[in-house]
Regions:
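A short beta-loop-alpha structural element at the N-terminal edge
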Residues: 1-16
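Conserved acetyl-CoA-binding loop-helix of GNAT-fold acetyltransferases
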Residues: 76, 82-95
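A short, aromatic/hydrophobic, helix- or strand-capping loop or linear motif
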Residues: 25-35
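A short helix-loop-beta-strand connector motif used in the catalytic cores of GNAT acetyltransferases and
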Residues: 37-49, 70
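Conserved GNAT acetyl-CoA-binding A-motif
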Residues: 97-105
Length: 105
């Protein structure tokens, strides 16, 4: 598994992943490609995707208000669960938040 920063180029794969996860509540405006691109521009260092078998199998999006960090959409492909992917994504966010001076998430 490889964890990398999410970019706008990952949007279609991430959106497909979100749709594959039961109970994933999506908002037409905020979770549109344009909405996610704006979020990534504001939070370029705190959103990540997990790759395995050359495809996106996990995602985590997080942001900060300058004092606290917030974790938003976190999802793992149902066929790849129970492999530590979500834990690795959360660890990546926690490290990224620490690097930008955010200690409360």
């Amino acid at each position: 598994m490889e964890i990398i920063k999410m970019t706008k180029e990952h949007y279609s794969d991430v959106y497909e992943l979100w749709l594959s996860c039961k109970g994933m509540g999506l908002n037409n405006l905020d979770d549109s490609e344009q909405g996610i691109n704006k979020f990534l521009q504001r939070n370029p260092d705190t959103c990540f995707v997990a790759f395995e078998d050359n495809k996106v199998v996990g995602v985590i999006m997080a942001g900060s208000d300058g004092r606290r960090g917030y974790i938003y959409h976190t999802a793992v492909n149902p066929q790849y669960r129970k492999r530590g992917i979500a834990t690795a994504l959360v660890d990546a966010v926690m490290d990224a938040m620490k690097n930008i001076g955010i200690n409360k998430v």
